[in-house]
Amino acid sequence: MSDRTKGGLGQWFWVCWGVAMAWSLYRALFNEAWILDDEIAHYMISKDVWSDPRELWHPWSRPGRNILQFIPAYFGLTVARLWTLALAGFAMWLTGREGKRLGMVGLSILPLLMGFQWWFPELSYPVLTQTPFMVVWVGGVFLAMRKKMAWAALCWGYLPLVRHEGIALSALFGLWIIFAPGGFARHLLKGKWNEALKAFPRAAWLGFCTFLPLIVMNVASGLMRGEWPFMMFFESKPTEYYGSGPIWLYLKHLATGAGIPVVLLMIFGAFQKWRHLDWSLWLWATYPAYLIMHSLIYWKGLFASGGYYHFIMPMAPFVALVALRGFNGLWEKYGVKPAAAALAVVVVTGLMMPQQQWGVSDNHIPGLPVLNASLKPIAPPMKQSRFGQGVKEASEWVIKNAGGAEVLNHHAAASFWLYETGVKKLEAWGGYTPESPELCSGTLLIWDAHYSVQDDFGFTPERLEKVGWEVVENFAYKSVRIYRKK
């Protein structure tokens, strides 16, 4: 084992780590809202595992994410968020250790280049798939570089349990193994049949370790839920709802997600001279491959992608390492002042988080007047949007006025506000339509202009009025309503 894999990262690394993590911690503790509604749905499913163990293998909520988060979810949303943030901090440490193994200098600022990426503060702590995927991915690289191959294979095989596209990374890891020096496929290409035969047992063992998490998930899901998650990989277009987009969209997402300053440093770093190119470095190529894969998937409208920027946030460790190369190159060629200025811009814009201040709004909700956001020097904690506040107020109205009536809702936040209040809540995904006879007279509906009208539910105002639902109360410019069935 190389000496570069031993020893600590130095006190200044930990000072910068503390500064970077403090910014995310501040937002985790003081944000009153959430960056994505999906976080609340994931959290609720993780919490429900304790009353219904089958939910551990819930396909939409991703079993790999659930396994990592269902225990802290028992203690509440804040604890689950703090645990997830701790995983992000661990990923930052793993990235630093990899930087040391690679012989990089200036590692003390690596946490700043990672923690002040624009997407990091708002996606590092939520109960979502991003941080679990990030830590397992960089953990797989970390273990492989230290020759802990079976453990590395388990990490790479665990990725598709957290996010479906992880199966492509599992496959790339398999190719990296068999084409490595001394690998099974490399011997075959050279016509060295005896050597290939000798290398085969190792390749087979690591292949088994890579597939093991998928095998366990499918067996458990089959036994407990009667479902076989692996079949989703054979359904490339489960819905047309999410559409498609330009092939370059994820390049834009990388710039506005990680942040233009750090991406410019990364580009500069990518074009610095690479002195020691060996086979191990190719495992890091899975990161740009991941970006290319998402670009192609959304371009072709496959696998219900939606083209969302947060899908590529797990690239943060790679972005930070290559940006550090850029910082070092800037220092070597132009001196300390330009390098320090570049780092300052990364931190200042990381505190500003323009994509969060401009991009997170409810202007897309039908019926709401458009609000023009003003850019503040330091991004304030997130408040509930007008729409989100409307959902909260509607939920509070139901808690006070429902009596014994059954309540149906489609927004995950409403489920969150109604949780353990004694309200008789119906399952949103129970297959109900406005005409369902199971929805008896007096049933209440927390209707919202974003989710309720989607094809999966079909609760449009016109359809509701036609079959005898009446509006009882309005909230947030009528973008949220209480309906009662006559």
Positions of predicted regions on the chain:
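Hydrophobic/aromatic-rich transmembrane helices and adjacent perimembrane loops
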Residues: 130, 159-164, 168, 257-260, ...
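Membrane-embedded, lumen/periplasm-facing catalytic core of multi-pass transferases
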Residues: 346-412
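Transmembrane alpha-helix segments characteristic
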Residues: 14-21, 114, 206-208, 274-300
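Membrane-lumen/periplasm interface segments of specific transmembrane helices
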Residues: 23-24, 41, 179, 198-268, ...
